[in-house]
Amino acid sequence: MIKTLLAHVKEYKRPSLIAPLCAALEVFFDMSIPFVIAQLIDQGIQAGNMAVAMKFGLLMLFLAICGLTTGFLAGKFAAEASAGFAANLREGMYDNIQTFAFSNIDKYSTAGLVTRMTTDVTNVQNAYQMIIRVAVRAPLTVIFSMFMCFVVDRRLSIMFLIAVVILATSLYFIMRRAMTSFNYVFRKYDELNASVQENISGIRVVKAFVREDYENKKFTKAAENIYQLFVKAEKIVIFNNPIMMFIIFACMICLSWFGAHFIVAGSLTTGELTSLFSYIFAMMMSLMMLSMIMVMISMSTASAERISEVLTEKADIVNPENPLMEVPDGSICFDHVHFSYKHGSGEEVLSDIDLSIASGEIIGVIGGTGSGKTSFANLISRLYDVDAGSVTVGGHDVRQYDLEVLRDQVAVVLQKNILFSGTILDNLRWGNEDATEEECIEACRQACADEFIERFPDKYNTWIEQGGSNVSGGQKQRLCIARALLKKPKVLILDDSTSAVDTATDANIRRSFVETIPGTTKIIIAQRISSIQHADKILVLDGGKISGFASHDELLKTNAIYREINDVQQQDDGDFDMEGGA
């Protein structure tokens, strides 16, 4: 895990090394000052020698300036290194997520990924900054202070050493318990983020069903849960300060008592006693800082593990060696295909799918909920890989193609239509970033989207809000179809992508496809038989298996499931979503 994270320090190695070096120099300068003060008191002030007092005073000023300068540089470089490290982690996670296959994405919740790229990275950033600066400064201060205490007076230093051991042991047990609590706290952040994301993305539904109070209570409960867990963890950590202060004051009292006796006995000077007070205070403060560092590290350990999971996740689907860079045509063949979302689980979504589709054919796909319609389409563009058998496009196994080439030539309009914030043209050019405005207009004409776009005041420069919230469902579907058409694909898959348009527009879109892209293989997944009855062939899926694969007329004669759907839709003049397999 640590190796994975440190690999993203990259160009920030230099400030990451300079920061602890400056921190070490800062400790040297700061810890030299009490020793100089002791000499100033003993050899200058008490001896009445102003020349010596001036000399040590100037030396103390020089050391203070050097300590201030190196401390400033340590802070500057630590901030630069940690901020750059965090930026690289976010970029690394984002880049790796872009390579994920659908099967990889299925392992994580959206809220979980958002938490990793925000809260978790911030935790690691803060911990890294503490480690390369404070985690160097604090232990060096303890070591240097203890060394100087032994130089000044070994007898009193034994007392300090015992105090340090007692304090360190106490802090160890406190931090050990606190770490467990903090680790659990940050796992709960996913639930909070999921609640926020779900509520904001579905705010219109929340308001439509007047569920504001329910959602507020749900969020309050999640926030209160995290608050209580934090309080529980902090109740453990708060013992830090009283234990720390007790030991410091105990050391001060003992130092004052024994120091006074040693001064009277002539074995210790006033200046040396003053320096011992400074060193013991610096030592104890550094130990307290170390305890805070341990808290920060414990809080960030869980975050680091979660970040590492995303960074080390390998894409299940990658390009083959020497991939094919051209799809010859739109012919498709499923050769006894078996598929499940969890390989080896035995829960097959598709079972023994065996069929051939000629280039340029129009294929309808119909079936009940969970019958495998979308899974069937996803295999063609290799969004998932088959468990057994093979899927070929253009006469070649889809696993032999370059992924970008294959997905450019097999355009899919997914069941969930997503538009991004930007103009209509910006959204259309997701299909082809080099498309001219004329090509975009032509694609919209083919998708019957031009008729409503022309009614907008800004036409193709109309701004689309995030998620397409300012256009209707049918308008969104037609824009997504136009976006796919700009790819000029060999295969076009519409996954229930005209469900929100009226039947007349649906018919116009199908007619436009026949006239403008006759050579493109078109696979239309639908619930309405009217959307696919004119297809060359219709695939009927039931429980992940082929129930029928023929023309509309033939299926009416030979397939009971298809005939039942048709009869119900003819009778009710509506859609019928029969219950299918898992």
Place the predicted regions along the sequence by residue.
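Alpha-helical transmembrane segments of multi-pass membrane proteins
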Residues: 14-16, 22, 63-82, 129, ...
